[in-house]
Amino acid sequence: QFWWAGDAEQVSTYWYAYHSRWIPLELFEGAHARQLAATLFEASRRWTVGLHFNKAQAGASADAVERGRRTAMNPAVFRAAALAIIAAGGDGAPGVPGHEPDAAEARAARDRVDAAARIVREATPGAGSYVNETDYFEPNWQSEFWGENYARLLQIKRIYDPHNMFTCHHCVGSEGVIPARAVSASGRAR
Protein backbone atom coordinates (compact mmCIF):
# COMPACT_ATOMS: atom_id res chain seq x y z
CA GLN A 1 0.00 0.00 0.00
CA PHE A 2 1.38 3.40 -0.98
CA TRP A 3 -0.71 5.69 1.24
CA TRP A 4 -1.78 5.96 4.85
CA ALA A 5 -4.89 3.82 5.40
CA GLY A 6 -6.58 6.70 7.25
CA ASP A 7 -6.54 8.73 4.03
CA ALA A 8 -7.72 5.93 1.73
CA GLU A 9 -10.99 7.74 0.92
CA GLN A 10 -8.94 10.60 -0.57
CA VAL A 11 -7.20 8.41 -3.12
CA SER A 12 -8.48 9.38 -6.59
CA THR A 13 -10.90 11.96 -5.16
CA TYR A 14 -12.02 14.61 -7.62
CA TRP A 15 -11.80 17.83 -5.56
CA TYR A 16 -14.58 20.39 -6.05
CA ALA A 17 -13.15 22.95 -3.62
CA TYR A 18 -10.22 23.07 -1.23
CA HIS A 19 -9.21 25.76 1.27
CA SER A 20 -6.77 25.86 4.14
CA ARG A 21 -5.98 28.45 6.78
CA TRP A 22 -3.28 28.67 9.42
CA ILE A 23 -4.93 29.24 12.80
CA PRO A 24 -2.67 31.32 15.08
CA LEU A 25 -1.93 29.91 18.53
CA GLU A 26 -3.18 33.12 20.17
CA LEU A 27 -6.71 32.34 18.95
CA PHE A 28 -6.74 29.19 21.10
CA GLU A 29 -5.83 31.15 24.23
CA GLY A 30 -7.73 33.26 26.74
CA ALA A 31 -10.63 35.38 25.55
CA HIS A 32 -9.87 34.57 21.90
CA ALA A 33 -10.72 30.88 22.40
CA ARG A 34 -14.45 31.51 22.80
CA GLN A 35 -14.52 33.61 19.61
CA LEU A 36 -12.55 30.94 17.71
CA ALA A 37 -15.02 28.29 18.87
CA ALA A 38 -17.93 30.46 17.68
CA THR A 39 -16.21 31.05 14.33
CA LEU A 40 -15.53 27.36 13.77
CA PHE A 41 -19.07 26.46 14.78
CA GLU A 42 -20.51 29.07 12.39
CA ALA A 43 -18.29 27.84 9.55
CA SER A 44 -19.24 24.24 10.27
CA ARG A 45 -22.89 25.09 9.61
CA ARG A 46 -21.81 25.53 5.96
CA TRP A 47 -19.29 22.68 5.65
CA THR A 48 -17.00 20.47 7.72
CA VAL A 49 -13.92 22.21 9.10
CA GLY A 50 -11.00 19.92 9.92
CA LEU A 51 -8.25 21.09 12.28
CA HIS A 52 -4.83 19.54 11.69
CA PHE A 53 -2.60 20.13 14.68
CA ASN A 54 0.26 18.11 13.18
CA LYS A 55 1.05 20.67 10.46
CA ALA A 56 1.52 23.92 12.38
CA GLN A 57 4.72 24.91 14.14
CA ALA A 58 3.77 27.10 17.13
CA GLY A 59 5.57 25.67 20.12
CA ALA A 60 8.27 23.97 18.06
CA SER A 61 11.82 24.05 19.38
CA ALA A 62 13.84 27.19 18.70
CA ASP A 63 16.19 25.15 16.53
CA ALA A 64 13.34 23.77 14.41
CA VAL A 65 11.84 27.23 13.95
CA GLU A 66 15.21 28.71 12.98
CA ARG A 67 15.78 25.98 10.39
CA GLY A 68 12.23 26.40 9.12
CA ARG A 69 12.60 30.13 8.69
CA ARG A 70 15.35 29.50 6.14
CA THR A 71 12.86 27.69 3.89
CA ALA A 72 10.22 29.07 1.52
CA MET A 73 7.42 28.21 3.96
CA ASN A 74 5.02 31.02 4.86
CA PRO A 75 6.26 32.35 8.23
CA ALA A 76 2.65 32.25 9.46
CA VAL A 77 3.17 28.54 10.11
CA PHE A 78 5.46 29.39 13.04
CA ARG A 79 2.67 31.31 14.78
CA ALA A 80 0.00 28.70 14.00
CA ALA A 81 -1.27 25.97 16.29
CA ALA A 82 -3.35 24.27 13.60
CA LEU A 83 -4.18 24.19 9.92
CA ALA A 84 -7.89 24.37 9.16
CA ILE A 85 -8.85 22.45 6.03
CA ILE A 86 -12.24 22.87 4.40
CA ALA A 87 -12.62 20.73 1.29
CA ALA A 88 -15.14 18.81 -0.75
CA GLY A 89 -14.72 16.20 -3.39
CA GLY A 90 -16.25 13.08 -4.75
CA ASP A 91 -15.90 10.19 -7.10
CA GLY A 92 -15.33 10.97 -10.68
CA ALA A 93 -12.98 10.54 -13.54
CA PRO A 94 -13.45 13.48 -15.91
CA GLY A 95 -13.29 12.32 -19.49
CA VAL A 96 -14.12 8.70 -18.70
CA PRO A 97 -17.64 7.97 -19.97
CA GLY A 98 -19.97 6.89 -17.18
CA HIS A 99 -17.68 8.26 -14.48
CA GLU A 100 -18.14 12.02 -14.82
CA PRO A 101 -18.54 14.04 -11.62
CA ASP A 102 -22.03 15.35 -10.87
CA ALA A 103 -21.58 19.01 -11.91
CA ALA A 104 -24.57 20.32 -9.93
CA GLU A 105 -23.41 18.51 -6.78
CA ALA A 106 -19.88 19.81 -7.29
CA ARG A 107 -21.03 23.42 -7.66
CA ALA A 108 -23.27 23.22 -4.58
CA ALA A 109 -20.46 21.70 -2.50
CA ARG A 110 -17.99 24.29 -3.79
CA ASP A 111 -20.31 27.14 -2.79
CA ARG A 112 -20.74 25.75 0.72
CA VAL A 113 -17.00 25.15 1.15
CA ASP A 114 -16.28 28.68 -0.07
CA ALA A 115 -18.82 30.09 2.42
CA ALA A 116 -17.27 28.18 5.34
CA ALA A 117 -13.76 29.20 4.29
CA ARG A 118 -14.78 32.86 4.08
CA ILE A 119 -15.93 32.77 7.72
CA VAL A 120 -12.63 31.27 8.91
CA ARG A 121 -10.59 33.64 6.75
CA GLU A 122 -12.38 36.74 8.08
CA ALA A 123 -11.56 35.64 11.63
CA THR A 124 -7.86 35.11 10.83
CA PRO A 125 -6.63 38.14 8.87
CA GLY A 126 -3.08 37.71 7.60
CA ALA A 127 -2.86 34.11 8.81
CA GLY A 128 -2.11 32.67 5.39
CA SER A 129 -2.72 29.33 3.77
CA TYR A 130 -0.67 26.18 3.18
CA VAL A 131 0.46 26.27 -0.44
CA ASN A 132 0.17 22.48 -0.90
CA GLU A 133 -3.40 22.26 0.40
CA THR A 134 -5.30 25.30 -0.71
CA ASP A 135 -7.62 27.08 -3.10
CA TYR A 136 -6.37 26.80 -6.69
CA PHE A 137 -8.12 30.09 -7.43
CA GLU A 138 -6.66 32.11 -4.53
CA PRO A 139 -6.43 35.71 -5.80
CA ASN A 140 -3.88 36.87 -3.20
CA TRP A 141 -1.66 33.84 -3.51
CA GLN A 142 1.67 35.66 -3.08
CA SER A 143 0.85 36.76 0.46
CA GLU A 144 -1.42 33.84 1.36
CA PHE A 145 1.04 31.09 0.34
CA TRP A 146 4.43 32.73 0.84
CA GLY A 147 3.82 35.61 3.28
CA GLU A 148 6.67 38.00 3.89
CA ASN A 149 9.04 35.55 2.15
CA TYR A 150 7.64 36.32 -1.30
CA ALA A 151 9.92 39.28 -2.15
CA ARG A 152 13.04 37.33 -1.12
CA LEU A 153 11.92 34.25 -3.02
CA LEU A 154 11.19 36.30 -6.14
CA GLN A 155 14.69 37.80 -6.01
CA ILE A 156 16.18 34.32 -5.81
CA LYS A 157 13.94 33.12 -8.65
CA ARG A 158 15.05 36.00 -10.90
CA ILE A 159 18.72 35.22 -10.26
CA TYR A 160 18.61 31.45 -10.82
CA ASP A 161 15.71 31.18 -13.29
CA PRO A 162 15.53 34.53 -15.12
CA HIS A 163 13.58 33.06 -18.05
CA ASN A 164 10.99 31.35 -15.83
CA MET A 165 11.83 27.93 -17.22
CA PHE A 166 10.65 26.22 -14.03
CA THR A 167 7.17 27.33 -13.11
CA CYS A 168 3.78 26.17 -12.01
CA HIS A 169 0.43 27.68 -11.11
CA HIS A 170 0.89 30.12 -8.21
CA CYS A 171 4.57 29.39 -7.80
CA VAL A 172 6.97 32.22 -7.10
CA GLY A 173 7.39 34.28 -10.27
CA SER A 174 4.42 32.73 -12.07
CA GLU A 175 2.51 35.99 -12.50
CA GLY A 176 1.22 36.14 -16.06
CA VAL A 177 2.30 32.59 -16.89
CA ILE A 178 -1.22 31.12 -16.81
CA PRO A 179 -3.18 32.27 -19.88
CA ALA A 180 -5.97 34.71 -18.99
CA ARG A 181 -8.50 32.63 -20.90
CA ALA A 182 -8.05 29.76 -18.41
CA VAL A 183 -9.72 31.70 -15.61
CA SER A 184 -13.05 33.50 -15.75
CA ALA A 185 -13.72 36.98 -14.38
CA SER A 186 -15.08 35.36 -11.21
CA GLY A 187 -11.74 33.64 -10.66
CA ARG A 188 -13.11 30.22 -11.51
CA ALA A 189 -11.75 27.94 -14.22
CA ARG A 190 -13.70 27.94 -17.43
Regions found by a protein language model. Give the residues of each.
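Soluble FAD-dependent oxygen oxidases
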Residues: 1-190
